[in-house]
Amino acid sequence: MKATKVKFYHKGDTLVYNADAFQLAEGSMLDALIRQLPGAELRKDGQIYVNGKFVDNLLLNGKDFFRGDNTVMLENLPNYMVSSINVYDKLGKNSKFAGYEMADDKQYVMDVKLKKQYSIGWTGNVEGGGGTKERYLGRFFAMRFTDHSRLAIYGNANNLNDSRKPGENDNWSPSNLGGGLKEQQFGGIDYFIDDRNGKYNLDGNVQVKHQETTSITHTNRKNFLSGGDTYERMVNSNRNQELIFNTSHRLYFEGKNINLELLPKINFHKFDNTTNYSSLSLSKDFASFGKKQLDSLFSMNLGKELLNFAINRNLQNGKLKGHTLETSISANSVIKFKNSPDNINLYADASYRDAKEEHFDHN
């Protein structure tokens, strides 16, 4: 007889997965482990479901990690560091401070617990690769742990159009792959500082992403007509550039009878999109002309040989550029009264938005 490890069990209202009970390929990250968890489902963009219920937040040792972007932890945390994965309903800080569950202050979370030997120290990984047609991938991840703080940094640069991985549960068709070439560079920093006495904590993250997508579509068509065949060539090119900057932070302070939480955020998105369209109809096959003549299709002055057989021509150029800036800060506080179950809840927020868009067309 051969003993097998228990893969999961319930501890009160918490569902606990034993990470060591799952066999994974060497070098696997957290995402590969979660895909094997019974009842768990990993979907596009890092969304996680357990027994059909959406997981609101993915935690690391009970703390936020790149809040709102699960993919950073999923793709960079080695599975061998994980001791267990706990799934449960977590009350917010205000509920814990007040001593009872407050409205809209509970989340369904997946909490990744690290093994003791990895709870203090450095960890990191680096990956690089290349392929045909000048495809490449390079990324790194490093993290520093102590019993009351954490600092993580990551970066990624690639021109891989398809970011899916084997085993993802996702509906896919060839149209999802997209056309053209997508180049992207992104990175970020995440930090957490916790007071040993639990009176305050500070956490936040900064992420930057640059992305450029270029696509060119060529279409050739022959029309069979009684009065003589005609030939058409159409070229459509697009270049889309984006710069995205996101940062969010949280400061929490807790006194004897009052607490305070501040949540500042900044989101910035800059875009620059260019479109060029050229089409030409001839009474003679395009194969009859040389490269120099055919290249003139993209210029204002059409080649003389093409001009002699031209039926109609269309040139269109477009440009769309602009930006969006959104900033906000919110504050909430709970004030307790001595020898009374009552309390006062205070909330305030302020926000600012600036957007600009310019559109140019030329025919």
Regions found by a protein language model. Name each.
Residues 1-23, 43-45, 51-55, 89, ...:
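Short, acidic, small-residue-rich periplasmic hinge/interaction motif at the N-terminus
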Residues 12-14, 43-45, 53-55, 80-82, ...:
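Extracytoplasmic
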Residues 24-28:
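Soluble non-cytosolic domains of exported or imported proteins
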Residues 31-66, 84, 94-104:
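Extracytoplasmic beta-strand/coil segments of soluble accessory domains associated
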Residues 63-92, 147:
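Short acidic/polar hinge/loop motifs at secondary-structure boundaries
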Residues 68-71, 91-134, 148-363:
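Primarily recognizes Gram-negative and organellar outer-membrane beta-barrels
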